[in-house]
Amino acid sequence: MSDRLTLLRPDDWHIHLRDGAALANTVGDAARTFGRAIVMPNLVPPVRNAAEADAYRQRILAARPAASRFEPLMVLYLTDRTSAEEIRTAKASGFVHAAKLYPAGATTNSDSGVTRIDNIFEALEAMAEVGMPLLVHGEVTRAEVDVFDREKQFIDEHLRRVVERFPTLKVVFEHITTGDAAQFVREAPANVGATITAHHLLYNRNHMLVGGIRPHFYCLPILKRNTHQEALLDAAVSGNPKFFLGTDSAPHARHAKEAACGCAGCYSAYAAIELYAEAFEQRNALDKLEGFASLHGPDFYGLPRNTDRITLVREEWQAPASLPFGDFDVVPLRAGETLRWKLLEAGA
């Protein structure tokens, strides 16, 4: 068993960097490991057009550590009113790489999201024409649907129809959490892929609920039962190029998580590749990590692979109990616990 693991530099195909003072912390954590990241647009107000995406991109670039080459890949937030012209303008910008479907009310800052899938068909047609991928938060939001069933229900009610109606549209089913989603992606045409988070590979709902409620495991889509966790691990280590890394690292200030009505999101960017390495090692599949983390994503998006490399070493270290987050602090995933892999910093 090797104690060193060298990979082409990975990318994160789903991250939340937030905005304002928090960028000074979140951008550095992401840039430490990743060459590029697909940056979620669910700000307040959301990133709805190329001009807003450019302004946000400039704020991210200004927060990069010195000498960093980290590249934010910007995303539009689809609304019921997103036009085909806005899609074409965004594609022509060269820095907007996708558009995101948030069903209204599905997750953090999704109130401006899409109320009916049919309302964005004009935008989806334009996206298919210009080659812009659709990123999907795949959950229905009707009150009568159990929170643990919302992903499967979304597949049956909406996603199959979108994939069939727009056969040339690239679709990324983001942060999949169920065996149903993994099976759907495997059986779908080649233009359908999926991201998987480290926390959905490492944890299930028992970790969040047994022995007391642990708010720092609370995320959306919510952690599912262990059989779904195993199905996600199967998909991640399979070598299937449809599955690739997307952390969904989503920081919230401590007081917003440790509350009577806490926010959804796990902060993993500070040690993302180390956490994925632990998950892959559980399956004796470290040889499949580079494909999942560094190759499948850029290949799906039609972007060049990174050419530089990172090295992980088998070395135990203690995750910090908290990290700075703008004017507050954030409790990261695995806070205070021991991690088994460590990223070698440049020059180490």
Swiss-Prot record:
Binding locations of Zn(2+) 2: K100, H137, H175
Active site residues per record: D248
Keyword Metal-binding among record annotations: yes
Cofactor needs: Zn(2+)
Pathway(s) annotated for this protein in UniProt: Pyrimidine metabolism; UMP biosynthesis via de novo pathway; (S)-dihydroorotate from bicarbonate: step 3/3
GO BP: any one term: 'de novo' pyrimidine nucleobase biosynthetic process
Binding positions (Zn(2+) 1): H14, H16, K100, D248
Sequence similarity: Belongs to the metallo-dependent hydrolases superfamily. DHOase family. Class II DHOase subfamily.
Protein name (database record): Dihydroorotase
PROSITE patterns (alphabetical): DIHYDROOROTASE_1, DIHYDROOROTASE_2
Oligomer status and interactors: Homodimer.
Pfam short name (any one): Amidohydro_1
